[in-house]
């Protein structure tokens, strides 16, 4: 999801089982203002006049404005929106972040189980967990150091396979946490990895999927940004790559892929949260992921790519760069999206909206989905926005990790069964 947060922040050391100390958001509120006929420009004016940051910025009538308000601006803001509908997403954002960032301890060498999904975790604990998980299933999986981030962190991946051995079937590739603050995507992609491994030869549908595809799961595509959200700014989005001549670091990695790179769905301003970079594909992590995906494609091709995001409860298809163009495979993409959403909803009743990226959420240039479909020629290329629709937004309580994983797995299994069926 998109926003324009840019605060100066304090750093703190990451310690498992400790409450982390990022920038103090105590007293900040997050308020949703649904736009209606005639008030879009007024809501935009309030945001500009009070110099407020947004999690969602309203561009048209009917879109929600999810607005972050510092304590000093709350009286003015509430006066300005008097008479408008509003919903409090976070009464005290600092308290919500404090509750979310109390990590449960994880000891390397522990046999992973469902308890991992009771809490969010530090970057280093994610590496230990993935290696421990793979260690339980050595004959049909491998832990892969897929490459290094700009700051030298490991970009981890799990590679899973069934009958026929590794690299013998078309690949499924899942990406999580390309946007640093979207922590639920890290946990949900790991839940799917855990389920595909632990339920193989127990659950017939999962066994069939693992036997029919090579599965590659990259839970932390943007490790530098992810680590930064745990030490300095919980709401950071981009990577941490410096921008020469600019005071603001980072580029939005999902605006940096070398396809339809320039357009209104990205920014040339290094301080923007949707900064596309100085050149197409110049992000350190994007270079790593392009190289990995090309390598995987060279084996038996890529049957499906899914880039997991939050928040919004959406499951979307190409294109992001255009709201009018459609790929030749549009009907198949829409069919599979509906199958995913229906199966997901059957688990906990969570509704998902489906459709093309541009017309469903907003216009995007240089995104992974369009690049994978048009440049790498992946057969099916999709993206999701996981829970929720805005009640908690990016700061999703830990008690929603497990239900998010359960319903996303159900949707994914149903969708991949349909792919196998043809």
From Swiss-Prot:
Propeptide residues per the UniProt entry: 18-112
Record PROSITE patterns: CARBOXYPEPT_ZN_1 (PS00132), PEPTIDASE_M14 (PS52035)
Peptidase M14 domain sequence ranges: 119-419
Protein's cellular compartments: Secreted
The keyword Amino-acid biosynthesis is assigned to this record: no
Lineage: Eukaryota, Fungi, Dikarya, Ascomycota, Pezizomycotina
Cofactor note: Binds 1 zinc ion per subunit.
Alphabetized SUPFAM superfamilies for the sequence: Protease propeptides/inhibitors (SSF54897), Zn-dependent exopeptidases (SSF53187)
Main location: secreted
Organism domain of life: Eukaryota
InterPro entries with a match to the protein in the record: M14A-like_propep, M14A_act_pep, Peptidase_M14
Protein name (Swiss-Prot/TrEMBL): Metallocarboxypeptidase A
Residues reported in the UniProt entry to bind substrate: 179-182, 237, 254-255, 310-311
Organism per entry: Arthroderma otae (strain ATCC MYA-4605 / CBS 113480)
Cofactor requirement: Zn(2+)
Residues involved in Zn(2+) binding: 179, 182, 309
GO cellular component labels: extracellular region
Disulfide pairings: 248-271
GO molecular function: metallocarboxypeptidase activity; zinc ion binding
Function as written in the Swiss-Prot or TrEMBL entry: Extracellular metalloprotease that contributes to pathogenicity.
Alphabetical UniProt keywords: Carboxypeptidase, Disulfide bond, Hydrolase, Metal-binding, Metalloprotease, Protease, Secreted, Signal, Virulence, Zinc, Zymogen
Biological processes per GO annotation: proteolysis
Enzyme kind, highest EC tier: hydrolase
């Amino acid at each position: 999801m998109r926003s324009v947060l840019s605060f100066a922040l304090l750093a703190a050391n990451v310690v498992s089982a400790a409450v982390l100390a990022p920038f103090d958001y105590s007293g900040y509120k997050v308020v949703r203002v649904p736009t209606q006929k005639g008030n879009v420009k007024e809501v935009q004016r309030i945001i500009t006049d009070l110099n407020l940051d947004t999690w969602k910025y309203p561009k048209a009538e009917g879109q929600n404005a999810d607005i972050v308000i510092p304590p000093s601006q709350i009286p003015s803001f509430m006066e300005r929106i008097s008479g408008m509908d509003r919903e409090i997403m976070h009464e005290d954002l600092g308290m919500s972040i404090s509750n979310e960032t109390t990590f449960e301890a994880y000891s390397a060498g522990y046999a992973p189980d469902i308890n991992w999904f009771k809490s969010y975790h530090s970057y280093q604990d994610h590496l230990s967990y993935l290696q421990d998980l793979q260690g339980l299933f050595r004959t049909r999986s491998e832990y892969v150091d897929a490459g290094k981030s700009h700051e030298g962190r490991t970009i981890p991946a799990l590679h899973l396979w069934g009958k026929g051995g590794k690299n013998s079937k078309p690949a499924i590739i899942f990406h999580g946490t390309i946007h640093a603050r979207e922590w639920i995507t890290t946990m949900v992609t790991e839940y799917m990895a855990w389920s595909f491994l632990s339920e193989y030869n127990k659950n017939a549908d999962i066994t069939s999927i693992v036997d029919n595809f090579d599965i590659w799961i990259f839970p932390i595509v943007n490790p530098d940004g992810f680590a930064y959200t745990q030490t300095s700014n919980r709401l950071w989005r981009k990577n941490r790559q410096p921008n020469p001549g600019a005071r603001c670091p980072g580029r939005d990695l999902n605006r940096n892929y070398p396809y339809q790179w320039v357009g209104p769905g990205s920014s040339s301003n290094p301080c923007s949260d949707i900064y596309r970079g100085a050149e197409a594909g110049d992000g350190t992590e994007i270079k790593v992921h392009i190289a990995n995906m090309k390598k995987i494609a060279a084996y038996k091709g890529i049957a499906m790519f899914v880039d997991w995001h939050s928040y919004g409860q959406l499951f979307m298809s190409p294109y992001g760069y255009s709201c009018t163009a459609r790929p030749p495979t549009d009907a198949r993409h829409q069919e599979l999206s509906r199958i995913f959403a229906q199966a997901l909803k059957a688990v906990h009743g969570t509704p998902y909206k489906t459709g093309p990226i541009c017309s469903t959420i907003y216009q995007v240039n240089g995104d992974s989905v369009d690049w994978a479909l048009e440049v790498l020629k992946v057969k099916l290329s999709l993206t999701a926005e996981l829970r929720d629709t805005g009640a908690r937004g990016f700061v999703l309580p830990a008690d929603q990790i497990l239900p998010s994983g359960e319903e996303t797995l159900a949707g994914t299994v149903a969708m991949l069964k349909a792919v196998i069926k043809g």
